[in-house]
Amino acid sequence: MITSSLPLTDLHRHLDGNIRTQTILELGQKFGVKLPANTLQTLTPYVQIVEAEPSLVAFLSKLDWGVAVLGDLDACRRVAYENVEDALNARIDYAELRFSPYYMAMKHSLPVTGVVEAVVDGVRAGVRDFGIQANLIGIMSRTFGTDACQQELDAILSQKNHIVAVDLAGDELGQPGDRFIQHFKQVRDAGLHVTVHAGEAAGPESMWQAIRDLGATRIGHGVKAIHDPKLMDYLAQHRIGIESCLTSNLQTSTVDSLATHPLKRFLEHGILACINTDDPAVEGIELPYEYEVAAPQAGLSQEQIRQAQLNGLELAFLSDSEKKALLAKAALRG
């Protein structure tokens, strides 16, 4: 269960993987995009996981209809704004919303820098209107190669004062981290944090690479760390965060069952692991479900769930004073 007197964070939440089905329908109609179905009920199976997918790439294909309807920058702004409202409705106090501007721009050849500006505008408006805290993480989608990632990074860095970190996501097997060393040097030189999707489709070596070569202080998913005792020790000793996404890992067939998910063992090992959603609209879940259903099914005790919630605050890309303010606000709820 969620401890209401502590801040609730979601640090691994894809803005472009959380586009409402109703919004997809409306934008599809507006921009003349031929969708596979034209009602909420019939479109849902195309944009939401119905049963576990055989691979990460198959899972990611469910996101494609959401970005296919982003016909102009106002559509990107709308989706960003709605993401903040969705976080509020999920009882989240602080969200880090990540997005790939190249992926969002691709279908309708939007200017990548314009997409970043629109998302920044939408999230800032949402924070103003809905009263929760949110920050942005820019994603380089390695699926599209190193040149596209440089274009993406240039766009992200053009708004670096409104972005807290840069991530590397996408095809972990086909585009290993060693191709992006120079990209992340630019990220660190710009003073931004680094989080990397690793140890999801590829093995522990991908996580070592993210930490040593790319400068990651947090790892997205990281489930394969369980196969490397030295890595487990390193993560605990150096306080490298693991952004765990229980239902997502089940739906991508990264784990066979929640009962075999390594999150419980990460926490027992003293690793700073926290609970997150990933792509809530695609998964058909929200953060309370992860705490109240998925985490107990993964074998976590109530104390471990509470620890994971605390870890989320510790790992947040926030200043100490911002974290203290969130703690004080949550404490008033009792």
Swiss-Prot record:
Catalytic residues as annotated in Swiss-Prot or TrEMBL: E200
Top EC class, one word: hydrolase
Gene Ontology MF annotations: 2'-deoxyadenosine deaminase activity; adenosine deaminase activity; zinc ion binding
Reactions catalysed according to its record: adenosine + H2O + H(+) = inosine + NH4(+); 2'-deoxyadenosine + H2O + H(+) = 2'-deoxyinosine + NH4(+)
EC number: 3.5.4.4
The keyword Magnesium belongs to this UniProt entry's keyword annotation: no
One of the protein's GO biological processes: purine ribonucleoside monophosphate biosynthetic process
Positions with a binding annotation for substrate: H14, D16, G170, D279
Pfam families on file: A_deaminase
Superkingdom assignment: Bacteria
Cofactor binding notes: Binds 1 zinc ion per subunit.
Cofactor or coenzyme needed: Zn(2+)
Binding residues for pentostatin: H14, L15, D16, S141, G170, E200, H221, D278
Keyword Cell membrane: no
Secretion signal span: none
InterPro entries: A_deaminase, A_deaminase_dom, Ado/ade_deaminase, Metal_Hydrolase
GO cellular component annotations of the record: cytosol
PANTHER family, per database record: ADENOSINE DEAMINASE
Cited function: Catalyzes the hydrolytic deamination of adenosine and 2-deoxyadenosine.
Family of the protein in this entry: Belongs to the metallo-dependent hydrolases superfamily. Adenosine and AMP deaminases family. Adenosine deaminase subfamily.
Protein name: Adenosine deaminase
Taxonomic source organism: Vibrio cholerae serotype O1 (strain ATCC 39315 / El Tor Inaba N16961)
Organism taxonomic ancestry: Bacteria, Pseudomonadati, Pseudomonadota, Gammaproteobacteria, Vibrionales
